[in-house]
Amino acid sequence: EAEFTRSNKGISSGFMNWMYSDIWPSATWAVVDYYCEPKQAYYQMKRSYAPVVVTYVQNEQKQLQLVLLVDGLQTVTVDVNYGMRTLDGKTLWQRTATLSAEGGGADTADVTDECNAPDSYLFAEYVTDGVKHDTVFSYDMWHTCKFVSDYVYKVDKLTDCYAVTVAANQFAKGVTLKMTDNYKFTYSDNYVDLQAGEQTTLYIYGATDDDIATLEVTDFAKETA
């Protein structure tokens, strides 16, 4: 929703985050709960509002498009590798596109290949400022995907934080780190999607060895089993 709004900023009149935090312990549309713990929506909004994002949206004619969104002041040009993969990592098709947008603008390319096979998703990979980024997208909000929990993780103690590295053997949806009294800690990221063969490192600040002993790594498949 946020990415669609950004791609249509000339006609959408902007995006309002209606409620930042809960005012009592309850379930609402706020992105931070009553105890000041960020919800999944908080982390997704952080990703969706990055200064430079390549993602997928549908236009008014319901045509699926690859879109580059730029909110900085400089013109950005990216070479995008995009396509469709199965949850176990098989690439069904793959294309390349070059997108370029001025600051505050957007650029699009129509996606004309088949994109509605079950247990599959669309991906987009690109590099900005020497850093590789990837986006994953489902045409039907993941309803036809049967996720499994097939990943490993390790924890390393660093000078000022703990590093948790998660490596996925199959697509891992919404990998989440949590501990007892989870609201006390700061996470560099959370509720992350990992493609098959991909790994990421998340950092936890403000925790002790005793806190880390309560660490649980879970995901969408486990939580909905």
Placement of each model-derived feature along the sequence:
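A compact, surface-exposed functional segment
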Residues: 210-225
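Carbohydrate-binding surfaces of carbohydrate-active enzymes
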Residues: 1-189, 194-203, 222-223
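Short, charged beta-turn/beta-strand-edge "cap" motif at the junction between a beta-strand
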Residues: 205-209
